Amino acid sequence: MEPMSGLAVSPADQKQAFAGLSPPKNPPLRQRPHLTRPQGQAYLAGIPVTPKGTAMAFTLPDLPYAHDALAPLGMSKETLEFHHDLHHKAYVDNGNKLLAGSPHEGKSLEEIVVATYAAGAVAQSGLFNNASQHWNHNLFWEVMGPAGKAMPGALESALVAAFGSVAKFKEDFAAAGAGQFGAGWCWLVRDKDGALKVTKTENGVNPLCFGQTALLGCDVWEHSYYIDFRNKRPAYLTNFRDKLVNWEAVTARM
């Protein structure tokens, strides 16, 4: 089943659309030490990658926490069941179908994203869309957590240096997500010149396409927030940045 687009879809409609489907049984999230050079950055960031030569570059990871672990922080069990178990799984399944027999078979996920991105294209290819969304969601799950720990000093200092204050960064990050027209993502990235920047991208486009390192990403497709926040995207973004982000995971990507 194709992932839901940016249309307003009620929780009842989503349940009907996915009726009969059950959450997949997945292998545990694994980090693999034998990687090609282009994969090193993603591996050090803690993002699952697939070694070159492995046919199936798309594998759905388990969540790094229970489905109900984020509910007290504003992201319900139902949202994670739909978002991870069905939407993300659809990107994995569709991506594997499109990858089979293509010139990109055997490449790493990161290599596929970069190779299939077409700058300036009105619509990206099906393989790119599914590969990039798979990569995006791998990062999304990893930068959230129920721990609620304080922001590490190294990250705080870097944000103050780049934005003037942590509060200004949070303001810019939420504004980028709220200002993204239609489906997309907002990001905290380290640019090629080393500077920290807030960016936004449409649909499944991600920082890999521009040679940037993603430190934090937030999904602003409607399926990511409609169950819990209905059409209130700004409230979802405020809740994400203030309650859901695992700042230690973000710091590890620096």
What residue ranges belong to the model's regions?
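Charged/polar low-complexity intrinsically disordered segments
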Residues: 14-16, 25-26, 39-41
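Cationic, low-complexity basic patches in intrinsically disordered or flexible, solvent-exposed regions
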Residues: 3, 16, 32
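Short, Lys/Arg-enriched N-terminal segments with co-localized hydrophobic residues
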Residues: 34-55
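Bacterial carbohydrate/catabolite-sensing allosteric modules
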Residues: 1, 28-30, 223
